[in-house]
Curated annotation (Swiss-Prot):
It is an enzyme of class 1 (oxidoreductase). One of its GO terms (biological process) is protoporphyrinogen IX biosynthetic process from glutamate. Catalyzes the NADPH-dependent reduction of glutamyl-tRNA(Glu) to glutamate 1-semialdehyde (GSA). NADP(+) binds at residues 184-189. GO terms for molecular function: glutamyl-tRNA reductase activity; NADP binding. It comes from Neisseria meningitidis serogroup C / serotype 2a (strain ATCC 700532 / DSM 15464 / FAM18). The active site is at 50 (nucleophile). This is Glutamyl-tRNA reductase. Substrate binds at residues 49-52, 104, 109-111, 115. Pathway: Porphyrin-containing compound metabolism; protoporphyrin-IX biosynthesis; 5-aminolevulinate from L-glutamyl-tRNA(Glu): step 1/2. It comes from the Bacteria. The record marks 94 as: Important for activity. It catalyses: (S)-4-amino-5-oxopentanoate + tRNA(Glu) + NADP(+) = L-glutamyl-tRNA(Glu) + NADPH + H(+).
Length: 415
């Protein structure tokens, strides 16, 4: 089985497909353990973010696709058009590019590197990684660090979090006059909330499944932040001008009916809603309502392109560095794969040497001259070492040109 990757991202699949193939954080340990113990793969890492789901494996790509479809109870033909399947070298290149932010919606964004590290940590905890994936991701983190240190690819990047504030400012002139509701209390919400907090909104509320986690985030945000439970949403939604949601829920949290009731109470005041979750937290039909401005991760593309031109120049240098590191890694791995063969070859040579030497000692004991023994020894050793390759070449026909070329290279006969 070889190193391979199967996946889809914001470039190959719309949100409606990506959300069907996303892995919830709570399910990820069981999923990666299951994959690494299936007939599809012997090693596995699953990366699942709002913009991509990727399975890095040592395995069979067709079986991995079948496993992915079965896991999500989807027909293969429904997901296949959106998937990419990568061979060994392209898997290495892709992993390096993703970690460097070169494949991100926001060119050079740093958050993806942390997400890859989290995915690797989960895989390690589930013992689903072996020598090949460990080597790949150790090199991936090293390359990402070098690219981000030696190039300007990540400078001036507009993050999804900062873009959220920019988008809200297009609808409301002053964030300071707004009540902002955050649904969820994970990493993405914390990043977005931090940007909003810098604009000093009138009120910030964090709604979460557990009050303790909501309170923890409120404590970080400042005095004008308060916690509440998700179950409170129907009663309080109308009080907020901005709603940002990003949870790990597999089902929508905010439905069209809930928003309709909130809009009636708001009396035509606009409600800005940003759904950064995959799968989506807010029903898509909410976008059809008057005075409800619903945006998803796919709607953020134009906003996050700010400063992209300057970063693209830096990206060219980053791509060159990535290509060099890919070639270096592939050479190292191919060298390691040859080690057992080299050992076996040397063992065979040593075996032949001992046999010929034993014969020579017997001849000397019988009174043969040293010259005769050395002559016979050299002929026997030559015959033993060349017997197997000579036999193989005699059997090889014209169609086996690769073998003939390989032998010519090994013995430097192609000059």
């Amino acid at each position: 089985m070889q190193l391979t990757a199967v996946g889809l991202n914001h470039q190959t699949a719309p949100l409606s497909i990506r959300e069907k193939l996303a892995f919830a954080a709570a399910c990820l340990p069981e999923a990666v353990r299951n994959l690494a113990r299936s007939n599809a793969a012997t090693e596995a890492v699953i990366l699942s973010t709002c913009n991509r789901t990727e399975l890095y494996c040592v395995g069979d790509s067709e079986e991995i696709i079948r496993w992915l479809a079965d896991y999500h109870s989807l027909p293969i033909e429904e997901i296949s058009p959106y998937l990419y399947t990568l061979g060994m070298q392209e898997t290495v290149r892709h992993a390096f590019r993703v970690a460097c932010g070169l494949d991100s919606m926001v060119l050079g964004e740093p958050q993806i590197l942390g997400q890859i590290k989290d995915a690797v940590r989960v895989a390690q905890e589930q013992e689903s990684m072996g020598k090949k994936l460990n080597a790949l991701f150790q090199k991936t983190f090293s390359v990402a660090k070098e690219v981000r240190t030696d190039t300007a690819v990540g400078e001036n990047s507009v993050s999804m979090a900062s873009a959220s504030v920019k988008l809200a400012e297009q609808i409301f002139p002053d964030i300071g006059d707004l009540n902002v509701l955050f649904i969820g209390a994970g990493e993405m919400i914390e990043l977005v909330a931090t940007y909003f907090a810098a604009k000093s909104p009138r009120l910030m509320t964090v709604a979460n499944r557990t009050l303790a986690r909501a309170q923890e985030l409120c404590d970080k945000l400042g005095v004008n932040a308060e916690p509440c439970l998700l179950s409170d949403l129907p009663a309080i939604l109308h009080e907020y001008d901005v709603v940002v949601s990003s949870t790990a829920s597999q089902l929508p949290i905010v439905g069209k009916g809930m928003v309709e009731r909130a809009l009636k109470q708001r009396q035509s005041m606009p409600l800005f809603m940003l759904d950064l979750a995959v799968p989506r937290d807010i029903e898509a039909e909410v976008g059809d309502l008057n005075d409800a401005y619903l945006y998803t991760v796919d709607d953020m593309v134009n906003i996050v392109q700010s400063g992209k031109e300057a970063r693209q120049k830096a990206a060219a240098a980053a791509e060159t560095l990535v290509s060099e590191k890919v070639a270096e890694f592939v050479r190292q791995q191919q060298g390691r794969q040859s080690v057992p063969l080299i050992r076996a070859l040397r063992d065979e040579g040593e075996k032949a040497r001992k046999q010929v030497l034993e014969n020579a000692m017997k001849q000397l004991a019988k009174g043969a001259t040293a010259e005769e023994v050395l002559e016979r020894l050299s002929i026997q050793l030559t015959n033993k070492l060349l017997h197997s390759p000579t036999q193989t070449l005699n059997k090889a026909g014209e169609e086996d040109k690769d073998l003939v070329h390989a032998v010519a290279q090994i013995y430097h006969l192609d000059k």
